[in-house]
Curated annotation (Swiss-Prot):
Cofactor(s) it depends on: Mg(2+)
Site features described as Substrate discrimination, chain residue numbers: Y15
HAMAP family named among the record's database cross-references: DNApol_IV (MF_01113)
Record's function text: Poorly processive, error-prone DNA polymerase involved in untargeted mutagenesis. Copies undamaged DNA at stalled replication forks, which arise in vivo from mismatched or misaligned primer ends. These misaligned primers can be extended by PolIV. Exhibits no 3'-5' exonuclease (proofreading) activity. May be involved in translesional synthesis, in conjunction with the beta clamp from PolIII.
Descriptive protein name: DNA polymerase IV
Protein family: Belongs to the DNA polymerase type-Y family.
Principal cellular location given in the protein's record: cytoplasm
Organism: Alkalilimnicola ehrlichii (strain ATCC BAA-1101 / DSM 17681 / MLHE-1)
Chain positions recorded as Mg(2+) binding sites: D10, D105
Key words, A-Z: Cytoplasm, DNA damage, DNA repair, DNA replication, DNA-binding, DNA-directed DNA polymerase, Magnesium, Metal-binding, Mutator protein, Nucleotidyltransferase, Transferase
Active-site residues, Swiss-Prot/TrEMBL: E106
Length: 355
């Protein structure tokens, strides 16, 4: 097994923690950052006080308000979050050039060749967390292991403000006890399919041969086969220019009603818009992805002036859906993607929303 030293750093309830830091009166109170609870927006982040009420990211804001009527709802300040994130990313690069940001609040670091702290990834992670708190007043959790898969899982085990290490010699035993839903790349639909096959843990997955996995999961088979053994050779890649932002969902039961399809796509538009806002991007092309019940897949696209808001994205979806066989053929998956990306400032984003 590879003896790389990988750290996954994940800020704790990042957006909500920034708001509690900047507004001391909110400390200890349930804080939700995201859309208007009286509208169709979604939760971008929830403080740990809010999470105790069952609130989580991507949840409709109206539902979060029902779960916790006393929660404080705030609009995101993405320009502030991006500034803090840039400060943290600069700190990471003091230790290694191999930094792969996943979003504003998390990143992988390959510190295999870092000489600091005697080359100990655990001590490096501890020092990074301490420096983040010293410089920003925010806490971060970190996971340390021999690959990205294990480091990311480890970072979630002692949240908030925690550090967890999975040594290479414990990797296989750790994955064996892991629910398959925690394995990288296993979404809800794949998890349900695995469970119907009697696969509920990493140990169950490991019992399947590569041929059995290929019959069930096609091109993803080798990936699952390796992860079930605690192996993940994906390198830490410094960020490359993003070409598109998208979200999709597979339905437990096929959809037949176009009106329901548009309703189900609204949260996807919200997610894409939130991602664009976080990155300071807008896009000229909106693409609809449709997978029918027989697994035939098509895409339809519309291009125009750059869009960033959820309302602008949703406005293009009816025409795209009308150009498909939705309503005549059952649909099992829908996806929304924005491409042709351009960088926009907060002022430019506000101007876009006026048109």
């Amino acid at each position: 097994m590879s003896q790389r030293k990988i750290i996954h750093v994940d800020m704790d309830a990042f957006y909500a923690s920034v708001e509690q830091r900047d507004r001391p009166g909110l400390r200890g109170r349930p804080v939700v950052v995201g859309g208007d609870p009286n509208g169709r927006g979604v939760v971008a982040a929830a403080s740990y006080e809010a999470r105790r009420h069952g609130i989580h990211s991507a949840m409709p804001a109206w539902r979060a308000a029902r779960l916790c009527p006393d929660a404080v709802f705030l609009r995101p300040r993405f320009d502030v979050y991006r500034s803090i994130s840039a400060q943290i990313q600069a700190l990471f690069r003091e230790y290694t050039p191999l930094v792969e940001p996943l979003s504003l609040d998390e990143a992988y670091l390959d510190v295999s060749d870092c000489p600091r702290r005697g080359g100990s990834a655990t001590l490096i992670a501890r020092e990074i967390r301490a420096r983040i708190h010293e410089q920003t007043g925010l806490t971060a959790s970190a996971g340390v292991s021999c690959n990205k898969f294990l480091a990311k899982i480890a970072s979630d085990l002692d949240k908030p403000d925690g550090l967890h290490v999975i040594p290479p010699e414990q990797a296989e035993a750790f994955v064996a006890a892991l629910p398959v839903g925690k394995i990288h790349g296993v979404g809800q639909a794949t998890r349900q399919r695995m469970e119907r096959m009697g696969v509920r843990t990493g140990a169950d997955l490991r019992r399947l041969t590569l041929l059995e996995l290929q019959r069930a999961f096609g091109s993803r088979a080798r990936f699952y086969y390796e992860l079930a053994r605690g192996r993940d050779e994906r390198p830490v890649r410094p960020r490359r220019e993003r070409k598109s932002v998208g979200a999709e969902t597979t339905f437990g039961e096929d959809l037949n009603n176009p009106a329901e399809m548009l309703e189900r796509m609204a949260p996807l538009a919200d997610k894409v818009a939130a991602s664009l806002h976080r990155r300071g991007l807008a896009g000229r092309t909106v693409t609809l992805k449709v997978k029918y019940h027989d697994f035939r897949q098509i895409t339809r696209s519309l291009s125009g002036r750059p869009v960033q808001s959820a309302d602008e994205i949703r406005a293009r979806l009816p025409a795209l859906l009308q150009d498909t066989e939705a309503g005549d053929r059952p649909v099992r998956l829908l996806g929304v993607t924005v491409s042709g990306l351009v960088t926009v400032t907060p002022d430019q984003a506000r101007q876009l929303a006026l048109f």
